[in-house]
Amino acid sequence: MTNSIQFIDGCWEAGEGQLFKSIDPARNEVIWSGEAASETQVEKAILAARAAFPDWSGRSVEERLAICQKFSELLEENKEHLARTMAKETGKPVWETRTEVGAMMGKVAISERAYHERTGTVENDMPGAKAFIRHKPHGVVAVYGPYNFPGHLPNGHIVPALIAGNTVVFKPSELTPMVAQETVKLWEKAGIPAGVLNLVQGEVDTGKALSAHPQIDGLYFTGSSNTGHLLHKQFGGRPDKILALEMGGNNPLLVTNVADVDAAVHNIVQSAFITSGQRCTCARRLFIEDSEQGRAVLERLIEVTENILVDDYEADPQPFMGAMISAKAAGEMVDAQNELLHKGAKSLVRMKQTDSKKGFVTPGIVDVTGVEDLPDEEHFGPLLKVYRFKDIDAAIKEANNTRYGLSAGVLCDDEQTYRYFFKHIRAGIVNWNKPITGASSAAPFGGIGASGNHRASAYYAADYCAYPVASVEADSMSLPESLAPGLKF
């Protein structure tokens, strides 16, 4: 039976490209299959978005918001179905995918506030006229979604883009096509007009056809640094196109002078191992004071990590960690651990892949203190590297020794230490005594260096979804009392 997985110009249709499949990484079962969108279908989607743009952008923001709010209501009505779809396709526990759907539901209200605050109309009086600042949508924008948050993260681009009046062509991760399909069905049910939101499913060729098409006015990407850099090169010399890149990080978390050891360990675990380490903000490097207290924190961290429950997404009791996105990804994490051990790192908690055909791995901790030539890589999984330090300035210097700059944090009881850390650390998200995976949709989200291109998302997504237009306006004309030199009337 043909699976109509492409949503183009208001209609579902089968892809014309190669067959690809989605596999439940916790159970090694094929749960979805369909044909990729061809280059012709990608162009069809872009032209449909172009044709729909004048009407959609010409509507009042209240009309556009009404459809977005209906979408939010449908998320509420279908939250359990969508959460379980996410769990099957990503391997994340159901308790966690429910929180993702909740974040999607809250995005419309937050994006509405951001639209008015960041891109609203400003009026100022001036002699004989008024000055206005208004904003207009870019046109047709492409949205590329990741697999780790297949609902929430693309939603964070799509909702503000639609509110601003853009039309969208959405290319989700090829690893989570079912979540994308179910999400777009809710947009269809919400009454999104034909061509305003289009879905093109597929693998690399589909993505390349979309990013290379001359008719897109912008591209919003969340994913790996390697892909983001390729897109940046592709858009080089094209200042007419808006490009927003949200990429990863080699994120540091520093611990010093904490009285509550268990609270500190809880924050470390939440920073490093939540979502099986598959958040771009996850702590990859733990800087811990080489002292009696630091050793106590590390010993407790080892104990807690060894007892983290890893299991199926529907298991009862629910696990803290589910499967990674694929058996291949899980195997690559074990390989990354072994490479560090080969370089001289010491295993504190050994990561293991429990089944070579599934995405389950246990969390790992390696001590890399004194190890030379460590790769500045984002190991996208539950692998934490420990650096012991005696001098906080040296620790901060090493924390900054990365091409990335997404998230960072410090766990300490002294506010002065936090202020010092905040002043000297280079990152777009800096937390104190909270997990560094914690970020608010009511704040900007983004990093510096190889983590982004200065287009923060979340609350600041409104900024790249519209461009400012300055106007000086007068309802009548008259000659000035004093003419400029050299003029005669």
Swiss-Prot record:
Catalytic residues as annotated in Swiss-Prot or TrEMBL: E246, C280
CDD domains: ALDH_SGSD_AstD
Pathway(s) per entry: Amino-acid degradation; L-arginine degradation via AST pathway; L-glutamate and succinate from L-arginine: step 4/5
Keywords: Arginine metabolism, NAD, Oxidoreductase
Domain of life: Bacteria
Reaction(s) the record says it catalyses: N-succinyl-L-glutamate 5-semialdehyde + NAD(+) + H2O = N-succinyl-L-glutamate + NADH + 2 H(+)
EC number: 1.2.1.71
Gene Ontology terms describing biological process: arginine catabolic process to glutamate; arginine catabolic process to succinate
EC class of the enzyme, as a word: oxidoreductase
Coiled coil: none
Residue sites binding NAD(+) per the record: G223, S224, S225, N226, T227, G228
HAMAP family registered for this protein in UniProt: Aldedh_AstD (MF_01174)
Name by which UniProt lists this protein: N-succinylglutamate 5-semialdehyde dehydrogenase
Gene designation per UniProt: astD
